């Protein structure tokens, strides 16, 4: 098969593909980390639900930044719930962004493979 010349537009498409592919890999790691944090929060909520308001000294402290604060059990559970919701929203935003990127990645793959056939590997 004859070598197909690479035009400036082809190079821009290859560069865009590379950026999107790298961003997708980073977003996948971010989602994995967020899911781990969500699991930790769910575990903490489950442990807190086993506690009684009378277990004052056994109630874990709430971490805010680098500081820990002793709060009541209902406040702690509320904060954990808010944290879980916030992380879920972050996961949703990342997934939405990944879906858009994946659509564009497939478009670029199709364009580039149609021009370069087996002279290029985008997988």
Curated annotation (Swiss-Prot):
Belongs to the prefoldin subunit beta family. This is Probable prefoldin subunit 4. Pfam families: Prefoldin_2. Binds specifically to cytosolic chaperonin (c-CPN) and transfers target proteins to it. Binds to nascent polypeptide chain and promotes folding in an environment in which there are many competing pathways for nonnative proteins. InterPro entries: PFD_beta-like, PFDN4. Heterohexamer of two PFD-alpha type and four PFD-beta type subunits. GO terms for molecular function: unfolded protein binding. Coiled coil: none annotated. GO terms for biological process: protein folding. It comes from Schizosaccharomyces pombe (strain 972 / ATCC 24843) (Fission yeast). Keywords: Chaperone. The keyword Chaperone applies. One of its GO terms (cellular component) is cytoplasm.
């Amino acid at each position: 098969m004859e070598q197909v010349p690479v035009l400036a537009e082809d190079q821009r498409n290859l560069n865009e593909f590379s950026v999107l592919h790298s961003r997708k890999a980073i977003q996948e790691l971010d989602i994995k980390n967020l899911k781990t944090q969500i699991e930790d929060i769910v575990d903490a909520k489950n442990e807190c639900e086993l506690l009684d308001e009378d277990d004052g000294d056994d109630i874990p402290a709430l971490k805010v930044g680098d500081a820990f604060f002793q709060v009541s059990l209902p406040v702690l559970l509320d904060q954990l719930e808010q944290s879980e919701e916030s992380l879920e929203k972050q996961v949703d935003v990342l997934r939405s962004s990944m879906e858009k990127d994946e659509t564009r990645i497939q478009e670029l793959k199709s364009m580039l493979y149609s021009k370069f056939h087996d002279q290029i590997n985008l997988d």
